[in-house]
Design a protein with these regions (language model features):
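An acidic intrinsically disordered interaction segment
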Residues: 22-42, 87-91, 167-170, 184-185
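Alpha-helical support elements that line or immediately flank enzyme active sites
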Residues: 15-26, 71-79
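Glycine/charged-rich beta-loop-alpha catalytic/anionic-binding loops adjacent to active sites
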Residues: 1-3, 46-56, 103-108
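Acidic-glycine-rich active-site phosphate/pyrophosphate-binding loop
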Residues: 31-51, 95-103
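Conserved phosphate/anionic-ligand binding catalytic regions in large, soluble enzymes, centered on
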Residues: 1-17, 61-66
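Functionally critical mobile loop/hinge segments
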Residues: 76-185
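Alpha-helix capping and helix-loop boundary segments enriched in small/acidic/polar residues
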Residues: 5-8, 30, 54-62, 110-114, ...
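Glycine-rich phosphate/ribose-binding loops and adjacent secondary-structure elements
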Residues: 40-43, 49, 56, 62-67
Length: 185
């Protein structure tokens, strides 16, 4: 079974959360397949009602969608209800509302790699909260709508153009022009 991630730039989030959960809980292949189906459903909802593109919605759309997908998948894997999976997805997405997409030198490396790590932790935390009975008072579909509205409102410079945010810091500009002394990875 193949479950597509939200985007290449956020592609490590869902798999990291699902694999960490599967390895620590000794879950089987069938459980992982169900989790991927759940993740895919969340991704389809976000993609059809908003966007998963950093160029259109910022990193909140890319990493937020991937974290929401991962959170719902982990909730499914650990026996949570569909309602709990939606709460987990909503919480994961809410945690990154407003996050810009500001790739240094226009490459999907800095800060993307670290955002994948924090996105995986966001997914696991949100699943844990939902499984503990914590609910998102803002329903998932409304969180998705809010993310889309925020994405349209943020400046184009922080929507995958490498013209704002970390991309235009002095170090970001040095990296863009190939003057890197000790690359961060």
């Amino acid at each position: 079974c193949i479950g597509a991630g939200a985007t290449a730039g956020s592609g490590g989030i869902g798999p990291a959360a699902v694999l960490a959960c599967a390895q620590s809980g000794g879950l089987d292949r069938e459980g992982m397949v169900k989790a991927l189906v759940t993740a895919s459903a969340i991704g389809i909802i976000i993609g059809s009602r908003a966007t998963v593109s950093g160029a259109e919605g910022g990193c909140q759309a890319e990493c937020g969608a991937a974290a929401a997908m991962g959170a719902a998948a982990v909730t499914e894997m650990l026996g949570g209800s569909p309602e709990a999976a939606f709460h987990a997805a909503a919480m994961a997405l809410k945690n990154v509302l407003g996050l810009t997409c500001d790739p240094v030198a226009g490459l999907v490396e800095i800060p993307c790699i670290k955002r994948n790590a924090s996105g995986a932790m966001n997914a696991l935390l949100s699943a844990d909260l939902a499984l503990a009975g914590v609910k998102s008072y803002i329903p998932f579909d409304e969180v998705v709508a809010a993310m889309y509205a925020i994405g349209k409102a943020v400046p184009q410079s922080v929507r995958e153009t490498a013209k704002g945010g970390l991309a235009v810091t002095p170090t970001g500009m040095r990296l863009r022009h190939g003057n890197n002394k000790g690359e961060e990875k």
